[in-house]
């Protein structure tokens, strides 16, 4: 059974991918690596933004540009909220890395979403925080990613957590049509956020298994 200290050592031991936060790009040994999110995005069905905005504008008596602008505003606000919550959780957890979740104080955060996340972790009382914002990669597949948090249970199991701040999280498509599916080789999955996030966590799991093999 792996200990928290052993898990931390294996996780931080080289090699690890380099990351450029400005360009949001990973690299290793001079080679560019695709991010997990970019890899998954290539298997989503293209969204006809203008075509859909045209339909919404006609239905609601608005201009297409107004609809597009409102979508962009919502998208930017959602991204800002996600970054804020992630940063808040990270700051609150940093002093507790390597320690039991029971020591986490949900009141260390200000926003309701961050408080809920910390309260959720605190309920895992005997689990321990291994690491957060850990960079991983599969160099042979030219893909890399950063997991939000890794937790070790009292039984030695490693659990990956990834914080999401979506207004909603669809697990299934509302229709069964072919155009509601992702692209090959994952065309059996509904093209919804639930599938995208499941693929993301599965990729992190593969990277961890390679790291701990």
Indicate where each model-derived feature is located.
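Charged, glycine-rich intrinsically disordered N-terminal tails and low-complexity linkers that flank
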Residues: 1-84
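Catalytic cores of nuclease domains that cleave nucleic-acid phosphodiester backbones
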Residues: 73-186
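A structural signal for alpha-helix termini and helix-coil/disorder junctions
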Residues: 42, 46-49, 91-95, 123, ...
């Amino acid at each position: 059974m792996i200990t928290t200290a052993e898990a931390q050592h294996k996780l931080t031991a080289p090699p690890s991918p380099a990351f450029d936060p400005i360009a949001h790009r990973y690299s290793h040994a001079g080679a560019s690596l695709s991010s997990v999110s970019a890899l998954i995005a290539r298997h989503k069905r293209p969204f006809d933004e203008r075509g859909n905005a045209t339909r919404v504008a006609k239905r609601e008596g608005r201009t297409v540009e107004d609809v597009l602008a409102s979508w962009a505003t919502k998208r930017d606000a959602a991204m800002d909220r996600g970054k804020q919550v992630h940063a808040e959780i990270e700051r609150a957890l940093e002093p507790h890395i390597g320690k039991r979740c029971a020591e986490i104080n949900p009141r260390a955060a200000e926003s309701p979403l961050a408080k809920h996340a910390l309260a959720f972790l605190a309920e895992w009382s005997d689990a321990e925080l291994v690491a957060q914002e850990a960079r991983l990669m599969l160099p042979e597949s030219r893909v890399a990613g950063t997991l939000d948090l890794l937790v070790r249970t009292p039984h030695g199991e490693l659990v990956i957590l990834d914080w999401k701040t979506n207004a909603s999280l669809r697990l299934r498509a509302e229709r069964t049509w072919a155009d509601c599916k992702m692209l090959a080789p994952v065309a059996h999955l509904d093209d919804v956020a639930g599938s995208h996030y499941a693929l993301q966590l599965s990729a992190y799991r593969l990277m961890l298994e390679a790291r701990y093999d």
